[in-house]
UniProtKB/Swiss-Prot annotation:
This is tRNA uridine(34) hydroxylase. It catalyses: uridine(34) in tRNA + AH2 + O2 = 5-hydroxyuridine(34) in tRNA + A + H2O. It is an enzyme of class 1 (oxidoreductase). Disulfide bonds: none annotated.
Length: 315
């Protein structure tokens, strides 16, 4: 039976002094054996933590006492083994990097519940934009969604400004944009709606809870999602009902590998995949192969490979 609760959370709110929050939060996590990463910035908090159920509840109670966090609702999963090596509480300029320093992320667009999402994106007047990175989109996407082909979220503002010019050239600048955006768990699409509003787009919507809530709530026969959804944990990808998908993670380049690419002679488990095989030299491949051998050996013994006792990090 799974014994570790994994809680993914974020909240855009105003913290006047994130540094004053950092120390007590890190100390609490350390005292309770909670591990993971939490990012703090003047715009809020973001991260994922894991630990015993009671310990996670205590940390969440502490976070909910912070300004603007009273109704914080994390996404919860369960793991048989501790998925993190240590606790990190970091101060950042942004909790998710967009690179627009004057943006107010609390001035976001309109939430759309998963149950209402299909109707919205089926409207021919609505332009649907995927705010995730290109490698995530390749794993799965909503039918008809626009793929910005970004390498990072920070690329999104420049892409949007260029894309908007091309749209206005076709439709005319007087035609109002009506945009629906989505991401994995909600944080990127929420911040991107604030960005679009700052750019003067009035009708902007985002999927509440992101793709994960949609896949959890919408039955597959009614779904407009195609493929799987990449996730940033050991599952790599999930499908409807949040069932673990068929993608695996390449330990060489950290990119998802499809079932088709897993069948390629260029895929070597723990070493390389078709995307990075020719970019890695023999020395790199040999080191990766040795590390993978050690990982498999430790798994067979039922022990952690490295880092299980790393200290809490505050930076």
């Amino acid at each position: 039976m799974a014994s570790y609760r994994v809680a993914a959370l974020y909240r855009f709110t105003r913290f006047e002094d994130p540094a004053a929050i950092q120390g007590p939060l890190a100390a609490l996590c350390c005292s309770l054996g909670v591990k993971g990463t939490l990012l703090l910035a003047r715009e809020g908090i973001n991260g994922t933590i894991a630990g015993e159920d009671a310990a996670i509840e205590a940390v969440l109670a502490h976070i909910r006492a912070l300004p603007g966090c009273a109704d914080l609702t994390p996404k919860t999963a369960w793991a048989e083994r501790m998925p993190f090596y240590r606790m990190k509480v970091r101060l950042k300029k942004e909790i998710v990097t967009l690179g627009e320093p004057d943006l107010d992320p609390t001035d976001a667009g309109t939430y759309v519940e998963p149950a209402d999402w299909n109707a919205l994106i089926s409207d021919p007047d609505v332009l649907v934009i995927d705010t995730r990175n290109a490698y995530e989109v390749a794993v799965g996407r909503f039918e008809g969604a626009i793929d910005p082909q970004t390498a990072s979220f920070a690329d999104f503002p420049a892409w949007f400004r260029d894309w908007r010019k091309s749209v206005e050239a076709q439709r005319g600048p007087e035609a109002p944009l009506k945009v629906a955006m989505y991401c994995t768990g909600g944080i990127r699409c929420e911040k991107s709606t604030a960005f679009l509003k700052a750019e003067g787009v009035e009708q902007v919507f985002h999927l509440k809870g992101g793709v994960l809530d949609y896949l959890e709530q919408i039955p597959q026969p009614e779904s407009l999602w195609r493929g799987e959804c990449f996730v940033f944990d050991e599952r790599v990808s999930v499908g409807h009902g949040l069932v673990k998908g068929d993608h695996v993670l390449c330990r060489g380049c950290r990119m998802p590998v499809s079932p088709q690419d897993q069948a390629s002679p260029l895929y070597v488990e723990g070493v390389a995949c078709p995307a990075c095989h020719d970019q890695r030299n023999e020395e790199q491949k040999a080191r990766a192969a040795e590390r993978h051998r050690q990982v498999l050996h430790c798994e067979a013994l039922g022990v952690d490979h490295v880092g299980a006792t790393l200290p809490t990090k505050i930076d």
